[in-house]
């Protein structure tokens, strides 16, 4: 007999890390494997990723991007071609040294990212400006040998999409870089209900080998920042290293201008930490594997299960719906689907059938209402949209209430010690100040936002003339 009680989870106020771990396990998103840092995506977790993948894939294809697949292995000599790139990834690389019992003539890297493979391929297929642009995307897994791991947020192997494009001009590659960043931002806000801040990474924080890195940053329940997606403009850094040239419109050889960008299952970690509560997962409706669950009450009584099945037939025209007709108690089912974060629960029993109504319960607010069975097809899509907007607005209010503006080093240190959240402060642009803030205040630069504010004339750290406002914070 299955246990008739869903165990409680740790409260986020008591131990945020354990709260998060409890949710990913008890909501049956993942399980741990026998290899440290490698997670098993269970059906519910993978269905969530598939829904996210489907939306993103459609958006990329609609903007002219094509899916490809590159090998998992990269020869060491190929990885070494772009100096900054290899130095940036060297500590995290996993190496294959043997094939069977034989030692390989050259070590093979298990891809941490695929820039070098795409570059090698591009150098073979591009001759003229007529061959440009090339807009490629790949869905795959990558491996980075992380020391500290946590499901979705930082794992040894993770799933992602990585886009790689080459262009005729610097203007085109810059436009592509920002268009993708905007696509990521709209995906987070319009589908995951996560508000983001768009901006540029500092030189210290940018991607290894990039000319410029742009990011979307979001704020978690514990006041830490999460880098949710990045888009990189490589300029000609990689094309020069890999000799990717084309004949331009004047018959002269030029290097291509290149971009790279990606989002991963890390977004799922963000979704959990932005929306969930002490009762479990809260799923944003647009990507939820199941949007509506029907729980028959006293299903052994005549007509109850048949009515639930009839309702499912109507609702499946407008939402992803399932019936739980198992022999577990209604109480167990209520707890189970609350833990799994299903946006809407419908309860239908003999008395409800008599009144031609169902009990509708929202996961996000716990609000309960009686609704006519005849209105479900119309009401459910509107309610799912309402839930999405409510989740987004709640997360935005939380972010704004936990964002602080400071104008002095002492004020910044006090806020960082006493509060959790984003800190906005002016910066001179010097790496030395960035490193001092990291060491003495415990915050890193999250981004130089596109929407700038003039908080003061001086750098918060050294007092010299400030060049821009920066979002700072503790981060995953």
Swiss-Prot record:
Catalytic activity: tRNA(Pro) + L-proline + ATP = L-prolyl-tRNA(Pro) + AMP + diphosphate
Signal peptide (from-to): none
Entry's EC annotation: 6.1.1.15
Self-association state and partner proteins as the record states: Homodimer.
Record HAMAP family: Pro_tRNA_synth_type3
Lineage, broadest ranks: Bacteria, Bacillati, Bacillota, Bacilli, Bacillales
Name of this chain's protein: Proline--tRNA ligase 2
Task performed by this protein: Catalyzes the attachment of proline to tRNA(Pro) in a two-step reaction: proline is first activated by ATP to form Pro-AMP and then transferred to the acceptor end of tRNA(Pro).
């Amino acid at each position: 007999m299955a246990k008739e009680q869903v165990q409680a989870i740790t409260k986020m106020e008591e131990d945020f890390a354990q709260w998060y771990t409890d949710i990913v396990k008890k909501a049956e998103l993942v399980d741990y494997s026998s290899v440290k840092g490698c997670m098993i995506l269970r059906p519910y977790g993978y269905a969530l990723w598939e829904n996210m993948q489907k939306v993103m894939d459609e958006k990329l294809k609609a903007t002219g991007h094509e899916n490809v697949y590159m090998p998992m292995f990269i020869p060491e000599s190929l990885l070494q071609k772009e100096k900054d790139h290899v130095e940036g990834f060297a500590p995290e690389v996993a190496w294959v040294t043997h094939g069977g019992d034989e030692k390989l003539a050259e070590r093979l890297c298990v891809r941490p990212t695929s820039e070098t493979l795409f570059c090698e391929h591009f150098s073979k297929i591009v001759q003229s400006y007529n061959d440009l642009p090339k807009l490629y995307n790949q869905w795959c897994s990558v491996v980075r040998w992380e020391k500290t791991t946590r499901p979705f947020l930082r794992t040894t192997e993770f799933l992602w999409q990585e886009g790689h494009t080459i262009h005729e001009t610097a203007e085109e590659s810059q436009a592509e870089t920002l268009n993708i960043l905007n696509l990521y931002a709209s995906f987070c806000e319009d589908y995951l209900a996560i508000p983001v801040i768009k901006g540029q990474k500092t030189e210290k924080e940018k991607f290894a080998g990039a000319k410029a890195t742009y990011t979307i940053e979001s704020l978690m329940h514990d006041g830490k920042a999460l880098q949710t997606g990045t888009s990189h403009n490589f300029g000609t850094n990689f094309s020069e290293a890999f000799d990717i040239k084309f004949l331009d419109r004047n018959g002269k050889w030029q290097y291509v201008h290149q971009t790279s960008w990606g989002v991963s299952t890390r977004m799922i970690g963000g979704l959990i930490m932005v929306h969930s509560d002490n009762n479990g997962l809260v799923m944003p409706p647009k990507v939820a594997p199941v949007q509506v669950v029907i729980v028959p009450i006293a299903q052994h009584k005549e007509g109850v299960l048949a009515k639930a099945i009839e309702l499912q037939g109507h609702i499946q025209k407008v939402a992803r719906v399932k019936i739980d007709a198992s022999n577990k108690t209604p109480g167990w089912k209520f707890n189970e689907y609350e833990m799994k974060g299903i946006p809407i629960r419908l309860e239908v029993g003999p008395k409800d059938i008599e009144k031609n109504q169902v009990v509708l319960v929202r996961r996000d607010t716990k609000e309960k209402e009686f609704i006519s069975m005849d209105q479900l097809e119309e009401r459910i899509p509107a309610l799912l949209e309402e839930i999405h907007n409510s989740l987004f607005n709640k997360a935005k209010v939380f972010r704004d209430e936990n964002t602080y503006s400071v104008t002095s080093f002492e004020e910044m240190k006090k806020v960082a010690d006493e509060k959790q959240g984003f800190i906005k402060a002016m910066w001179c642009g010097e790496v030395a100040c960035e490193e001092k803030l990291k060491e003495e205040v415990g915050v890193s630069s999250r981004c130089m936002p596109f929407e700038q504010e003039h908080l003061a004339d001086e750098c918060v750290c050294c007092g010299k003339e400030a060049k821009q406002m920066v979002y700072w914070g503790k981060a995953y």
